[in-house]
A protein has these predicted regions:
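Histidine-centered metal-binding segments
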Residues: 1-17
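Short, charged, intrinsically disordered terminal tails
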Residues: 7, 78-83
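Short, contiguous, helix-prone interaction/anchoring segments in small proteins
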Residues: 19-55
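Amphipathic alpha-helix face/heptad-repeat signature
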Residues: 29, 62-65, 69
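Aromatic-residue detector
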Residues: 31-35, 62, 81
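Short, charged, amphipathic alpha-helical segments
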Residues: 56-61
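Amphipathic alpha-helical coiled-coil segments
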Residues: 66-80
């Protein structure tokens, strides 16, 4: 009897096609970054209200960076849709 009796791939039948998975991930990442950007901006306002304008400015920059990353994700989505 062979000791290598369990070598088949369990995921072979359940795997999502690559393009579909990538589209879903990009959509998720875009939403995720939007949520983070909103949260960073809320905390920037709180930081300003508490005399921490220097930190607030950095939080605003982080929010902007998150949305800039989304531009790349949106471009990737566009290219995937064009195939």
């Amino acid at each position: 009897m062979s000791t290598d009796h369990h070598h088949h791939d369990h995921d072979a039948h359940d795997e999502i096609p690559f393009d579909e998975k990538l589209l879903k991930l990009l959509g998720h990442w875009i939403k995720h970054n939007e949520d983070h950007a909103l949260n960073y901006r809320k905390w920037a306002e709180k930081a300003k209200a508490n005399g921490r304008s220097n930190a607030a400015g950095l939080l605003e920059e982080a929010a902007d960076m998150s949305l800039t990353i989304n531009e790349k994700f949106e471009a990737a989505l566009d290219r995937l849709h064009r195939k």
